[in-house]
């Protein structure tokens, strides 16, 4: 039997395998579902205006994660340990009617079951070793989150998005290289495979 010249992904695979986590494929900024009324304006709903990562060398994220000596202007954190981000919205956040979440993506074809697409749920209490985000401060139009990463997540440079749910679908922030987050191994975390006692 001769080889075909077309691209074959093998078996039941619907998408090609990831060959590099450095390659990027951005998720859509608007995912509408069902019928959308004629006058639908995404600006009528909760919108993200800015994201603060507290990524300066003197900020608590870099100091607490022992990454303040890295000469990189991105947020660098260690897996299995919580860090802070602040999201500014176009209006005050109301937890009874607004729903949003932070998403971390790595690689060209991100998938949740492969750990390359991570929708971080808002939780009332963070659990050790699991992804989660807890609201620690609400002030005017800003929300500060404590984000806990999994102790066994992929190590690398993640792209970060904020997704807001509306009655008609999801509105996601655009790709912003300033919100890229490096997640490293954590020898200070007991759940991490590289944990060192001393």
Curated annotation (Swiss-Prot):
Provide this UniProt record's keywords sorted from A to Z: Acetylation, Acyltransferase, Blood coagulation, Calcium, Cytoplasm, Hemostasis, Secreted, Transferase, Zymogen
Region described as Disordered: 1-36
Q: Show the SUPFAM superfamilies listed in the entry.
A: E set domains
Q: Which reaction does it catalyse?
A: L-glutaminyl-[protein] + L-lysyl-[protein] = [protein]-L-lysyl-N(6)-5-L-glutamyl-[protein] + NH4(+)
Site (Cleavage) residue list: 38-39
Q: Which Gene3D superfamilies match?
A: Immunoglobulins (2.60.40.10)
Q: Which cofactor does it need?
A: Ca(2+)
What does the UniProt function comment say about this protein? Answer: Factor XIII is activated by thrombin and calcium ion to a transglutaminase that catalyzes the formation of gamma-glutamyl-epsilon-lysine cross-links between fibrin chains, thus stabilizing the fibrin clot. Also cross-link alpha-2-plasmin inhibitor, or fibronectin, to the alpha chains of fibrin.
Q: Which family does it belong to?
A: Belongs to the transglutaminase superfamily. Transglutaminase family.
PANTHER family in alphabetical order = COAGULATION FACTOR XIII A CHAIN, PROTEIN-GLUTAMINE GAMMA-GLUTAMYLTRANSFERASE
Annotated protein name in UniProt = Coagulation factor XIII A chain
Organism, by scientific name, is Bos taurus
